[in-house]
């Protein structure tokens, strides 16, 4: 039997969930015509842990260690959104020093997240050298985190009304030294990557998203700013101390994978500027609002007895969440990270809805990869920058 020459046999291929370019347990069901992508269906849920339901049976302080497992490469942002929600709901003031410390930690976390995006992204498209270079600078950031918080990852550092501990002696000088050093490292990255003809061949004009299209899909962060939209929640919401610093929103108008790379490189430079300004202008004073410790604290008379003399009794501060609804958001490295909180006059949230930026940005992937080559999937997916911990929650 002869097969007509015009007939095309389509091939269905599973990419992931254990593929190294999937950045986690993401599975793509691809329909291919040779090397051309006809259709793409993402399959999610392999890392679902019920983070929203867990919050309904915990106080905010008890829930804080869980939130660092959403986006485990930018844990400071998941922590700050978790404490911002009850702070706004209960009208709790944050001391100025704590606000500056939070801003410094957030921007260091943004740089660390962008570095760990840059290395694997370059490895996905065939450049192995930057993958090893980024760990050199990232290690220095984690050393700073370890000195201030005691943990390299999953810091559990933010508290309602401030932070867990003040900056140790000499930490500010070490951080300033890192900022000066990192600017030279960033120039090295740009010299190595930005004008490389092979790199430009792989990313220029790949995965183009228009401005109106980005808004319609609900994209945020570098995905939105690379499409010509100057939208940064740090400028719009004036969260923490960002309005006190001199910095510029990084954006591009081309909307392709190269534009998303340039936005993130520019953001790292702006983050260094903000950290330097914060370190030079950090005020004195308390690092936490001590009044929050008085909320519903239980004390027992026997705790003052001899048997309890050497045992530290610091019960977790809890307070009644008023019967209100509240949406809080922060500009995370991957986009707008938000939490919708509903209180019902108890210590536990009645509803805790997470708005992860990676989940929203991933929706446009099937549209971007259609009619592209199979090898371009790694470029496009890498430029989106997803972490499956926050996508699946």
Swiss-Prot record:
Membrane topology, from the record: Peripheral membrane protein
Q: Where in the cell is it found?
A: Plastid, Chloroplast thylakoid membrane
Q: Does the keyword rRNA-binding apply?
A: no
- Annotated disulfide bonds: none
PROSITE patterns listed in its UniProt record = COMPLEX1_49K (PS00535)
Tell me where it mainly resides: plastid
Q: Which InterPro entries match?
A: NADH_Q_OxRdtase_suD, NADH_UbQ_OxRdtase_49kDa_CS, NDH1_su_D/H, NiFe-Hase_large
Q: Which gene encodes it?
A: ndhH
Its function? NDH shuttles electrons from NAD(P)H:plastoquinone, via FMN and iron-sulfur (Fe-S) centers, to quinones in the photosynthetic chain and possibly in a chloroplast respiratory chain. The immediate electron acceptor for the enzyme in this species is believed to be plastoquinone. Couples the redox reaction to proton translocation, and thus conserves the redox energy in a proton gradient.
Which Pfam families does the entry link to? Complex1_49kDa
Enumerate the PANTHER family for this protein.
Answer: NADH DEHYDROGENASE [UBIQUINONE] IRON-SULFUR PROTEIN 2, MITOCHONDRIAL (PTHR11993:SF10), NADH-UBIQUINONE OXIDOREDUCTASE 49 KDA SUBUNIT (PTHR11993)
Q: Give the family from UniProt.
A: Belongs to the complex I 49 kDa subunit family.
The name this protein carries in UniProt is NAD(P)H-quinone oxidoreductase subunit H, chloroplastic
- Name the source organism: Pelargonium hortorum
């Amino acid at each position: 039997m002869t097969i007509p020459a015009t007939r095309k046999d389509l091939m269905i291929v599973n990419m992931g969930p254990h593929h190294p370019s999937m950045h986690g347990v993401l599975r793509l069901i691809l329909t291919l015509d040779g090397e051309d992508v006809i259709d793409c269906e993402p399959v999610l849920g392999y890392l679902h842990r019920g983070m929203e339901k867990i919050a309904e049976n915990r106080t905010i302080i008890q829930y804080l260690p869980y939130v660092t497992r959403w986006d485990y490469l930018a844990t400071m942002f998941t922590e700050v959104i978790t404490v911002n929600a009850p702070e706004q709901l209960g009208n709790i003031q944050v001391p100025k020093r704590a606000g500056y410390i939070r801003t410094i930690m957030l921007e260091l976390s943004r740089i660390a997240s962008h570095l760990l995006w840059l290395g694997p992204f370059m490895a996905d498209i065939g450049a192995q050298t930057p993958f090893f270079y980024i760990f050199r600078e990232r290690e220095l950031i984690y050393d700073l985190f370890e000195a201030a918080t005691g943990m390299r990852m999953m810091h559990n550092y933010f508290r309602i009304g401030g932070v867990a501990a003040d900056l140790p002696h000499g930490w500010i000088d070490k951080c300033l030294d890192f900022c000066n050093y990192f600017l030279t490292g960033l120039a090295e990255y740009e010299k190595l990557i930005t004008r490389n003809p092979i790199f430009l061949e792989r990313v220029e004009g790949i995965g183009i998203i228009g401005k109106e299209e980005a808004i319609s899909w609900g994209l945020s962060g570098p995905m939105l700013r690379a499409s010509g939209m100057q939208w940064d929640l740090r400028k719009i919401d004036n969260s923490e101390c960002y309005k006190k610093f001199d910095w510029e929103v990084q954006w591009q108008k081309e909307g392709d994978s190269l534009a998303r790379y340039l936005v993130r490189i520019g953001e790292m430079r702006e983050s260094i500027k903000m950290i330097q300004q914060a370190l030079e202008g950090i005020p004195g004073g308390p690092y936490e609002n001590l009044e929050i410790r008085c909320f519903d604290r239980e004390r027992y008379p026997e705790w003052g007895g001899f048997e309890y003399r050497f045992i530290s009794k610091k019960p977790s501060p809890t307070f009644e969440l008023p019967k209100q609804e509240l949406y809080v958001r922060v500009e995370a490295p991957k986009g707008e990270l938000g939490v919708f909180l509903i209180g019902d006059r108890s210590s536990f949230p009645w509803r805790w809805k997470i708005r992860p930026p990676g989940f929203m940005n991933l929706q446009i992937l099937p549209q971007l990869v259609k009619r592209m080559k199979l090898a371009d999937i790694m470029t496009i997916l890498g430029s989106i920058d997803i972490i499956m911990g926050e996508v699946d929650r």
